[in-house]
Amino acid sequence: MIYLAGGASAAMPTVTPLRTRFDADRPVIGMVHLPPLPGTPACDGDRDAVRTRALEDARRLEAGGIDGLVLENFGDAPFHPDDVPKHTVAEMTAVATEVTDAVDVPVGINVLRNDADAALSVAAAVDADFVRVNVHVGTAATDQGVLEGRAHETLRLRDRIDADVAILADVHVKHATPVGDRSIDRAALEAVERGRADGVIVSGPGTGAETALEAVERVADALSERCSDDSEPPVFVGSGVTTDTVADCFAAGADGVIVGTALKEGAETTNPVSSERVGDLVAARDADSSAD
């Protein structure tokens, strides 16, 4: 059940729950960090190279045993705060179409820095499973300026275009400072209860930075206490996960992890994906599962 302001409740439009979209009980989601897209400062104009790299990374993730992936315009810095240009949406849709055709795992879309409408539109067009939204509710001070959540717009757009696309919302998102004094567990509850997010992400301060396990525990406990088993939104750890820390993330209450840097050759964020590193991390997850 989702609770609205004043204690009222309402049924959400039918969206396939995040937990049922993955074959694994504790999914490992890998990042496909797109090179700079056409129209961005660092782009060399080679569209074929962008698509080739995206497909190679997606296939390597799948070959390593990944449970899902997120396609993200990581190379587009400096990022537009929210409304990205139409050509960015077009490029991401074209690449996402090829990626979803090439792999047989759930795919998510993230349009940086915080264009949830664009991400949702791309996801709906290519039949992706979910979107990641950096600031879904609340306000964050970032290097793009002050970003405000637009949950009211995102949910209405999803309903209007009849998209079976789940919303995975960051709480106290990385590369940002939350405005106000809401605790991370309160922020997570508001993302779910008032923002109607289908799942939440807890991250460290930046890309590849370790996530505080205490924060994961607080968010997981808060959602567990408030929600029934059937409706409890999953909690994902969104940065700093490695083969050495993945078991600790699940022990802290995470339901899944999103991994980028640790799956790249040499553990460098901008390098290609290494299938071997993917396999090692998935094996570490599985070894922990078998020990339970």
Named regions from a protein language model:
Residues 1-25, 31, 51-52, 228, ...:
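Haloarchaeal acidic low-complexity proteome signature biased toward cell-envelope/secretome components but also
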Residues 29, 34-82, 95-105, 114-232, ...:
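Alpha/beta enzyme core
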Residues 14-17, 45-46, 183, 270-273:
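Alpha-helix capping and helix-coil boundary motifs
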Residues 85-92:
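A charged helix-plus-loop insertion that forms the helical arch/lid used to bind
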